[in-house]
Amino acid sequence: MTNEFLPVSRQDMAQRKIKQLDFVYVTGDAYVDHPSFAHAVISRVLEHHGYSVGIIAQPDWKDDKSITVLGEPRLGFLVSGGNMDSMVNHYSVSKKRRKSDAFSPGGVMGKRPDHATVVYCNLIRRTYKKIPVIIGGIEASLRRLAHYDYWSDSLKRSILLDSGADLLSYGMGERSIVEIAEALDSGLDIKDITFIDGTVYRTSHLEEVYDVTRLPSYESLTEDRLNYARSFYIQYCNTDPFSGKRLAEEYPNGIAVVQNPPQKPLTQDEMDIVYGLDYQRTWHPMYDSDGGVPAIEEVKFSLVSNRGCYGGCNFCALTFHQGRIIQTRSHESLLNEAKKFIEDKDFKGYIHDVGGPTANFRQRACKKQEKYGVCANRQCLFPKPCPNLIVDHSDYLKLLRELRSLPKVKKVF
């Protein structure tokens, strides 16, 4: 490990002999350098590929100077509302303001604005007019096309339009962000980066976009709720990276938002690399006086072993973010991570969680998915389990036993 947090000040940049950062990551969460926090993962992945990244965590959106603390980045700003949609973070289902924010120092509420992604982009644009702005994270990912907003009881446009960002990275963005960085670094204008899977862009020339499936227009969605249902169904049928089509949603004044097909899932080797990077596994020391960041407590001694879920539950948005194809880490990678944190002075012998969206999904649903992806019009588990479904928990049980056998480990959950 480097034993270094990512730069959060000019002093940090000077210590690393960085005159100008390649990227500045603006996030609605406090800076926690842990693989359960998206800003840490994306930033460390970029760092692994040779790019310098600084973090502006929870800037004061009422002060334009708060966005200039690290200077103008060479390639662009990365913006995320945080690990959770900022509105879900702020309000209960009854639309009452929550009293605490686990992703803020000391659990204090009010460190980020409502609709944080949009507000942060506007903050950047007031100071840096031409710098590329790329948005991502759960808030941007699930609002990438027209969507019903529960909080305002209205149909909102794509967050790409409302934020004024140049590009949106949806889903788990490790591969997309590296391709974006390489494109920008090669000298391509952000407006010309329209070819990367897992991204959404806007255009005034939809007729020039090839092989595109047109969704019902935004205007038609506001006129007929059945059009909204049709649009959602088309989107749902195109969440697979192997068969998903390019989608376009038209808006007034000749503007269209184009969603490229999803990125291919990471291989096990790639997953191992992502989770084996130089995370400090705790909050930045600048939060010590506040008592730290509460959100780390639930994941400090937990392990992310897999991604994706083929459950297909109606109430769950996971298909739209991580997809239905299971991606797993190797036993060696998980054991190495566990060996690191069991030496922590706060470790009491309990590994709190080993899993992901669904802990016992340690392999793809069937062999076909390796080459062809998921079935477009069939579910793995509904209305009854598919006969091709591989039901085998032996690998998961073996992993749990291996973790349990480590010194100082009492129980694994």
Label the predicted regions:
Residues 322-347, 402:
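Conserved alpha-helical substructure of the radical SAM core
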Residues 41-53:
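Short helix-loop-beta junction
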Residues 2-20, 30, 231-302:
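N-terminal [4Fe-4S]-dependent radical SAM core
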Residues 26-31, 290-317, 350:
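N-terminal pre-triad scaffold of radical SAM enzymes
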Residues 32-34, 44, 62-63, 85-87, ...:
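Flexible loop/turn segments at secondary-structure boundaries
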Residues 30, 38, 57-252, 259-260:
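Glycine-rich beta-alpha loop elements in corrinoid/cobalamin-binding modules
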Residues 166, 274, 309, 334:
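Conserved, mostly hydrophobic/aromatic
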Residues 25-28, 56, 60-61, 340-413:
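Conserved SAM/AdoMet-binding glycine-rich loop
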